Amino acid sequence: MEMTLRWYGSKFDTVTLEQIRQIPGVTGVITTLYDTAPGDVWSRERIQEMKAEVAAAGLHVAGIESVNVHDAIKTGSADRDKYIDNYIETLENLGKEDIHLVCYNFMPVFDWTRTELARQRPDGSTVLAYTQEAVDAINPEDMFASISGDMNGTVMPGWEPERMAKIKDLFAMYKDIDDEKLFENLKYFLERIMPVCDKYDINMAIHPDDPAWSVFGLPRIIINKKNILRMMEMVDNPHNGVTFCSGSYGTNLENDLPDMIRSLKGRIHFAHVRNLKFNSPTDFEEAAHLSSDGTFDMYEIMKALYDIGFDGPIRPDHGRMIWGEVAMPGYGLYDRALGATYLNGLWEAIEKGETRHAVK
């Protein structure tokens, strides 16, 4: 596997490439053209500029997160083919620039949902958190206003102000979309893009819905083992794979994370590994990556990835705000650097333990 860090670009990220380069074991970044609207084509020139900037810092672009899917594609509206054609052109340009991993999601309206961006933990750090009670007590239109004050002056993915300003229109677009229709639209999209993925060896890695259940009555389908296996079977192509995000699938305590990993052997193209601390099944907060700080056994998650021969990019996910850092919530430098080092340490211990066991 290759340890990476998510980076939003020098215009939007408080973390610099030079800082990322100094994290032991991190050799690449997962990045995006953050100022490109969903549905627009990524030009080769912009991709080349992005790669050159990353390479100048001694790193490389290990993958893209995300090439966002336009709502016309998710809803199956009359103009979806225009936006799919643009998506295919973007994939072709990425392939020509030797980029072979694209993380994306198929979540309606909201990318991910948290009700707090700065919940204080016992150690004084602040973290992202979710309570179903808070969601049930608020209108979708008021959701952005309720959390925007804790964004630290940054623009968070999936919560862009210009998108949130259209939230009523977005909900209207999805009023006739249920789980089955969303699956149909995902299948149509995947069938259209697989030829260009085959041509350029591009692995599409769908990100799970977060949290892994319906929010505000919206359909959510990438939520559990059964549904993800269905997605892979309906478009049975090795380039149709997943981003295994422990912190997203893990929002539903019924999901057995190590078992899911083993069932997805060969189709996990990218991994996000983080920990959550549950106060109840629908009240959780993000924790340090260390197993004892949260609910998940991080050793077992990494062991499962090792056992299936996972060799793709991996990254620590949302970090705490610690040591006075002011950054995009979840995406500061310090705690993610600690997380990367911890995950690398687990991997090295597992790898050497297996090797020494084999020698005996």
Question: What residues fall within each predicted segment?
Answer:
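A short glycine/small-residue-enriched secondary-structure motif
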Residues: 22, 58-74
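Histidine-acidic metal/acid-base catalytic patches
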Residues: 1-4, 9-14, 51-55, 72-76, ...
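Glycine-rich, positively charged N-terminal anion/phosphate-binding segment
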Residues: 13-17, 23, 41-60
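Short, well-ordered beta-to-alpha junction loops that form the rim of enzyme active sites
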Residues: 104-108, 208-210, 317-319
